[in-house]
Amino acid sequence: MTELTKEYIDNLKKIIEEKDDVKARELLKDLYPADIAEIYQKLDLQEAIYLYMLMDGEQAADVLMELDEEDRHKLLKELPNELIAKRFVDNMETDDAVDLMRELDEDTQEEILSHIEDVEQAGDIVDLLKYDEDTAGGLMGTEMIVVNENWSMPKCIDEMRKQAEEVN
């Protein structure tokens, strides 16, 4: 794990200032989302946006969910809703996408939903948003695992592991 020292942060800021995409991606690629979220707190908003644009969609979505709500709002406020849909929501598990959408006003939710490429995911998000956050419906996801009722327990467990990898 990379230690997030002052020197590391200063080096990253220099790389951002120089707009060295290759070096910045190299520094980010092995970091955990929680570490990148910690780095975010030491950057100004434009530096953070620059880094987000360099990450692949899955990493960007994971980092976004690691940010505290206030930092998430600052970032999302600066990005177009179409980009939020394509960069974050399209790369999130449905339950995480719903959690994110709950933080936004209804107009923003509708606009983001209109840009989600996966129509089924958009429908699932709309369905889950109907439930209060603290109810079973508000906490659940829509992904499920199916096994044959006649299978042995070890076969069921193997199949569940296989399907879980496909869902994730």
Protein language model features and the residues they cover:
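Hydrophobic packing positions in regular secondary-structure scaffolds
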Residues: 1-168
